[in-house]
A protein has these predicted regions:
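N-terminal lobe of the biotin/lipoate ligase/transferase fold
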Residues: 1-101
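Long, positively charged amphipathic alpha-helical accessory segments at protein N-termini or as interdomain linkers
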Residues: 9-10, 32, 74-105, 116-272
Length: 272
């Protein structure tokens, strides 16, 4: 396990492995070794990488950014609300930091994806053991070819940036992944640590700002969508207008033929 020379605002180490079963599993191991809040493990390849609902994550070795952040909160009541969505916001902002030409084209799809030009560029998986939180992130950075069904649904940053557009320093090479990682960590720190500091100092509700900023880049907001509540294979569907997200990150839909919003905590937003 190699220690990377990256600036981590959490003040914790960033480790790198060429190949792991999954960065999520390695992060759990590191938690057991008493690594601190904000420790990161990144890898060139995951042999058993997975996303939400145990879906596989198709990636070429060394082309994309794969990492997990270990966050220690002591007890579950201290975990920031809507952490997956707030991570999505951080990732989307970092992508625009990296590739300014994509500003306005990067959106967050409820509950855990980041879309670039209406195609999936990143996925987020958040797990907890009650005390520790593990945020797994996968971002398509330099991959240009995706297998099978992913070909029309996925996109990488290098594919999305227009020819001739300016990149942030270090982009379009192997170091781009780690440059993006550093930017994501800074954005994530701003989303989940700085608001707590401001709230404690000013007695303000820090959650208002993240929600408002997220709503402005919410994928399919204001459009007619199909939502599958609960399990992804459920035969129950809700059609209606996607009106936004609630204070805790819940999905808000105005069902077809109704006038009032309904809130959903989990389920699948069908957009393909």
């Amino acid at each position: 396990m190699k220690l990377l020379d990256l600036n981590n605002p959490f003040g914790a180490p960033v480790y790198h492995e060429e190949s792991v079963s999954s960065t999520m599993e390695t992060a759990r191991f590191l938690a057991g070794q008493n690594e601190g809040h904000g420790t990161v493990i990144t890898a060139d390849f995951q042999e058993a990488g997975r996303g939400r609902l145990k879906r596989s994550w198709a990636t070429e070795r060394g082309k994309n950014l794969l990492f997990t952040v270990l966050l220690r909160y002591g007890d579950i009541s201290s975990i920031p609300e809507a952490l997956t969505l707030r991570t999505g916001l951080a990732v989307s902002l970092a992508i625009e930091d990296l590739a300014p030409a994509l500003a306005g084209s990067v959106q967050v799809k409820w509950p855990n994806d980041v879309m670039v030009c209406s195609r999936k560029a990143a996925g987020i998986l958040t797990e907890t053991d009650g005390k520790n939180v593990f945020i797994g992130v996968g971002v398509n950075v330099n991959q240009r070819d995706f297998p099978g069904e992913y070909r029309s649904k996925a996109i990488s940053i290098v594919e999305a940036v227009p020819d001739g557009a300016a990149w942030s320093a270090g982009i379009a090479n192997e170091g781009a992944r780690f440059g993006l990682l550093e930017k994501i960590l800074f954005r994530l720190y701003e989303e989940i640590e700085k608001p707590k500091e401001a709230s404690a100092a000013l007695s303000l509700r820090a959650t208002d700002s993240w929600r408002e900023r997220l709503i402005r880049r919410l994928y399919k907001k204001g459009e007619t969508v199909t939502f599958i509540p609960g399990a992804a294979d459920s035969d129950t569907a809700v059609e209606g207008t996607f009106s936004g997200i609630g204070p805790g990150g819940e999905l808000l839909i105005i069902p077809r033929g109704e006038n009032e919003e309904k809130a959903f905590v989990n389920g699948e937003l069908r957009v393909y």
